Amino acid sequence: MSTSHASPRETTEGTVYTVTGGDWDEVVQSAARADDERIVVNMGPQHPSTHGVLRLILEIDGETVTEARCGIGYLHTGIEKNLEYRTWTQGTTFVTRMDYLTPFFNEAAYCLGVEKLLGIDDQIPDRATIIRVLLMELNRLSSHLVAIATGGMELGATTIMIYGFRDRELILDIYELITGLRMNHAYIRPGGLAQDLPPGAVDQIREFVKKMNKNLPEYDKLATGNPIFKARMQDVGYLDLAGCMALGATGPVLRSTGLPHDLRKTQPYCGYETYDFDVPTADTCDSYGRFLIRLEEMRQSLRIVEQCLDRLQPGPVMVADKKIAWPAQLALGPDGLGNSLDHIKKIMGTSMEALIHHFKLVTEGFRVPPAQVYTAVESPKGELGVHVVSDGGTRPFRVHFRDPSFTNLQAMAAMCEGGQVADVIVAVASIDPVMGGVDR
Amino acid sequence: MSDANNTAGDANEVNPEKDLSAENLPGQRGQGGEEIRVQRGMFGANNGGDTSGYGGLVRSVRLPGPASRPYGGWFDEVADELEGALEEQGLLPDNAIEKTVVDRGELTFHIEREHLVRVARTLRDDPALRFELCTGVSGVHYPHDKGRELHAVYHLRSITHNRLIRLEVSAPDGDPHIPSLVSVYPTNDWHERETYDFFGIVFDDHPALTRIMMPDDWQGFPQRKDYPLGGIPVEYKGAQIPAPDQRRSYS
């Protein structure tokens, strides 16, 4: 129970009487006790607005959420355990499936870790690094587009959903051209890339940048000033800087509190320090601020994509060390992507040593010195960290992904409790959790 | 027999001066570092005759060992500040910090588990350290590192000073208790539940240490090394492909 006055020691003006009387607290508490309207509602795991198989357990008093908890784990696939039974190279095939909306970030973070363990991080060819940055920034666009599209749809704004998925489709087309797949690429490999950009890719990306520069203002026109959109988003899902720090929230959630923390600026990797871009922030700590940040980050990503295209020079996309570089002379055959016929002709027909080398590297893989490293990249959702441990073998000893969706989702309770039921959906959407990343 | 092996080992000792690719060889640390396992044989075959000829292979798996001063860069500053701050609290740094490892540009403090919470609180609150963001905990299971089988690894980020350090704490399999850091870093709530779920490390004083990924009634801790991956053999183009954990292993 609170005291009814502040003592002279606590003030500069003598005893100050406050209006929070003990009676009032008692009245409120007894009213809450007498209330039998409190119910516990399970939202999900199959609810259309919970972003995948997320179960929200809400204790509701009328329209007010008094307690909120998450039930997760429905999408756990044991990826970290599976990695311990594959070679280091095969690992990318698994990690790309974690947060399936940010595959290139998962691959890049993992590969940067493996390369750091191998001590070859300074030998990665420039072209490979630039293509990695290019793909990561395209991926940031496509991830934010989904965040905005599905977030809008959960508010009932179907137009913004259609717009978002329309533009994301353009990016998926680029992925398909470059990697052969719309998701689950396994394109970034330890040491470089699986293969070089195909002919026509640069032109298509340039075309896309042009189109996207035209399309992005549409989101502004549709949503940014829209009174209904603002009414639903502003002051909803509030989490301030102290809350973010305590709960480990990063990414747009953290930047919406005004702290311009972005690993691309503070701990640059892949040469981000040489690119020209801004880190947008907001000072509202709410869902609307996070929406504005995502919108601005997409513009900044387009800037980086353009700079990448200008920098691309012909060259190798894999380290020169033949003990690590997967013999990735890939070509597109009638049955999909595979070893090129020329390469097969060479290893089967003329060089037995090349065959042995190919066989050893593909079946056994390369050894990684025993040690542990932590590498982190700024994924669209926040700090994506990878803790990689090697015991000197051809397989990872332990790989742990610190997925930003997992960590940020913890903040759900802090954002939702005391608010309206309808605002829970907005708050969760503003975190942008992807259950593939949360559960792994 | 053992003498013969030793002489063979000496003869095969890699000379980094001569062999430029020595750093790529698995046994490069020689006697330095921290031995976590001794590997015998190859391909995971340990019954039957030594048909491959690799059966006599003995390899010591060593993680990087303790570093000596100076650590380089800002590492010394952090180590000094941490030791000083602990001393101020009447805690002998040598009692709390088991060893300090510097490897691949990363600084690791191995902390005695009973002092973990105090060290973490110091790292968070001391203005010269100010590691305000914890990126969670990752468990590692070293089944052959007797007495220190279970490791909990924390990465702490200082946004104020733009630094990253690692804390490592170990616990024996028989007594898998490590104090919880939730009171210092609330973000570790779910991370510790995850590590408990997968490794069975019991984080004492965690507000609600329950399984988070696996079903509540699950038996065992899936990411321990002695927990099988599972899987069934599949037929591909007429051949039986064994389950992933039954395939030949080169590690």
From Swiss-Prot, chain A:
GO CC list: plasma membrane
Role summary: NDH-1 shuttles electrons from NADH, via FMN and iron-sulfur (Fe-S) centers, to quinones in the respiratory chain. The immediate electron acceptor for the enzyme in this species is believed to be a menaquinone. Couples the redox reaction to proton translocation (for every two electrons transferred, four hydrogen ions are translocated across the cytoplasmic membrane), and thus conserves the redox energy in a proton gradient.
Pfam families (UniProt xref): Complex1_49kDa
Key words, A-Z: Cell membrane, Membrane, NAD, Quinone, Translocase, Transport
Keyword Cell membrane in annotation: yes
Subunit: NDH-1 is composed of 14 different subunits. Subunits NuoB, C, D, E, F, and G constitute the peripheral sector of the complex.
Family, as annotated: Belongs to the complex I 49 kDa subunit family.
Major subcellular location class: membrane
GO MF entries: NAD binding; NADH:ubiquinone reductase (non-electrogenic) activity; quinone binding
Superkingdom in the source lineage: Bacteria
The enzyme's E.C. designation: 7.1.1.-
Mode of membrane association: Peripheral membrane protein
Phosphoprotein found in the keyword field: no
Protein name: NADH-quinone oxidoreductase subunit D 2
Catalytic activity: a quinone + NADH + 5 H(+)(in) = a quinol + NAD(+) + 4 H(+)(out)
Name of the gene encoding the protein in the UniProt record: nuoD2
Compartment(s) of residence: Cell membrane
Gene3D superfamilies assigned to the protein according to its UniProt record, in alphabetical order: Cytochrome-c3 Hydrogenase, chain B
InterPro entries named among the record's database cross-references: NADH_Q_OxRdtase_suD, NADH_UbQ_OxRdtase_49kDa_CS, NDH1_su_D/H, NiFe-Hase_large
Curated annotation (Swiss-Prot), chain B:
GO cellular component terms attached to this protein's record: plasma membrane
Enzyme superclass (EC): translocase
Predominant place of localization: membrane
GO molecular function: NADH dehydrogenase (ubiquinone) activity; NADH:ubiquinone reductase (non-electrogenic) activity; quinone binding
Physiological role: NDH-1 shuttles electrons from NADH, via FMN and iron-sulfur (Fe-S) centers, to quinones in the respiratory chain. The immediate electron acceptor for the enzyme in this species is believed to be a menaquinone. Couples the redox reaction to proton translocation (for every two electrons transferred, four hydrogen ions are translocated across the cytoplasmic membrane), and thus conserves the redox energy in a proton gradient.
Assembly and interaction partners: NDH-1 is composed of 14 different subunits. Subunits NuoB, C, D, E, F, and G constitute the peripheral sector of the complex.
Name assigned to this protein: NADH-quinone oxidoreductase subunit C
Organism (species): Streptomyces coelicolor (strain ATCC BAA-471 / A3(2) / M145)
Classification lineage: Bacteria, Bacillati, Actinomycetota, Actinomycetes, Kitasatosporales
